[in-house]
Amino acid sequence: MTEDTLPDTVPDTVLDTVLDTVLDTAISEPSMTAGEVEMQLFALERSRAQFAWKCGGLDAAGLRKPHPPSAMTLGGLLKHLALVEDQNVSIALTGQPLGAPWDAVDFEAEPDWEWRSAVDDSPEDLYALWRGAVQRSRAAWAEALEDEDLDRPSKFTTPSARSPNRRRFLVDLHDEYARHVGHADLLREAVDGLVGEDPPQR
């Protein structure tokens, strides 16, 4: 759902709230002659779109609903994957410390902070956090891969002074989504019965 697909009768105050909880689920197909970089980025974007479809448009109750015996929630997934996006860029591409809100958290003392604290966040804040992290990550990877060289070393150095290449971190990011999209499938079905693999496209 986008602004131009909403009824004309929706008041502006309601429209702002609705759009705050709507996530982009568009999937752009790769070219028929796509190389490795284009295909890797397409796979990541498709998983992001699938995740957005399963998490988008919900109120606080929907985002906080667990699927027993697991305590996992869609809100927790949004916050966790926002952290993963920012960590991936920080570790692999920039070598810079994490910014807000992550820099104020002692993850050694609270390793599950993003999962636990999501219950206190509004839907608008959770959606904005995830959107912002995706935008930063997308921009950072686009800049890093202007040379289309996934073999270049990342900014991360192991204790043995080795640096995994950028391919490793891009695959790791997609793998994290692939894992959690499956969780989101089950959680969303339990909320309102939504099922399916890919979000409907125009």
Where do the language-model regions lie?
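Acidic/histidine-rich alpha-helical segments that form the ligand environment
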Residues: 110-152, 167-176
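An N-terminal RHG(E/S)-centered segment typical of histidine phosphatases
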Residues: 1-6, 24-27
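Short, contiguous alpha-helical
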Residues: 2-5, 37, 41-55, 60-112, ...
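Long, intrinsically disordered low-complexity tandem-repeat segments
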Residues: 7-22
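Short, charged, low-complexity loops and linkers
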Residues: 27-40, 116-119
